[in-house]
A protein has these predicted regions:
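An amphipathic alpha-helical interaction segment
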Residues: 130-180
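Generic protein-terminus/edge-of-domain signal
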Residues: 1-72, 78-79, 113, 124-128
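Residue-level marker of positions within ordered structural domains that often coincide
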Residues: 53, 101, 121, 152, ...
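Short histidine-centered beta-strand/loop micro-motifs
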Residues: 35-42, 84-86, 106-108, 158
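Hydrophobic aliphatic residues
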Residues: 27-29, 120, 173
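A hydrophobic/aromatic-rich effector-binding and dimerization subdomain
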Residues: 2-24, 80-148
């Protein structure tokens, strides 16, 4: 059994990748956590979740989601979140966690100020459920699946491919939020 470890302010104590490649791709099972849930925590990284099988009750700040097989979630930077087993059933999922600088490159770049901060600094946009019946949501789910495939057998240009996919996902999120 595992559990998330946090500081007193609930910030997760875990490295999500490293400075050179700030991405963590992690297959998970909710049943592997003590008592079938992971503790409330936050981190500066953005988190994309894809439900491989089963269901999970997922909380982000004050929002509750029921995530089912084939669905997913965008969890913004610095959002408090937790996940719980649903009706005692296991849930397998993939978590792709990455630092925002992986998208924008360097501090105060146009990519940061125009495209990344626009989303990460808006407290109203703490999360977004990727639904099965929304085409652009399913495009993102397929891209998360592509990242999963790449991680299983990393090709020579693995990091570059992951970067391009995450930038494409970010573009879709940006176009959604800029139209709000």
């Amino acid at each position: 059994m595992v559990q998330i470890h946090t500081e007193k302010n609930q910030k997760e104590i875990k490295r999500h990748g490293n400075y050179e490649f700030p991405v963590n791709i992690s297959p998970e099972s909710i049943q592997s956590y003590e008592q079938g849930y992971f503790l409330w925590h936050w981190h500066p990284e953005i988190e994309l979740t894809w439900i491989i099988s089963g269901q999970m009750e997922y909380y982000v700040n004050d929002q509750k989601y029921l995530l089912s097989e084939g669905e997913g979630l965008f969890g913004n930077s610095n959002t408090l979140h937790s996940g719980y087993m649903k009706d005692g059933q296991d849930c397998d999922y993939l978590s792709v966690t990455f630092h925002p600088r992986f998208i924008y490159g360097y501090e105060n770049s146009l990519l940061q100020t125009k495209y990344v901060d626009f989303i990460t600094s808006n407290e109203l946009w703490h999360s977004l459920k990727f639904e099965k019946d929304v085409t652009w949501h399913q495009d993102i789910i397929r891209q998360i699946q592509d990242i999963c495939q790449l991680a299983q057998e990393p090709p020579e240009d693995y990091e570059l491919q992951v970067h391009m996919i995450l930038c494409s996902i970010w573009q879709k999120l940006y176009l959604h939020y800029v139209s709000q």
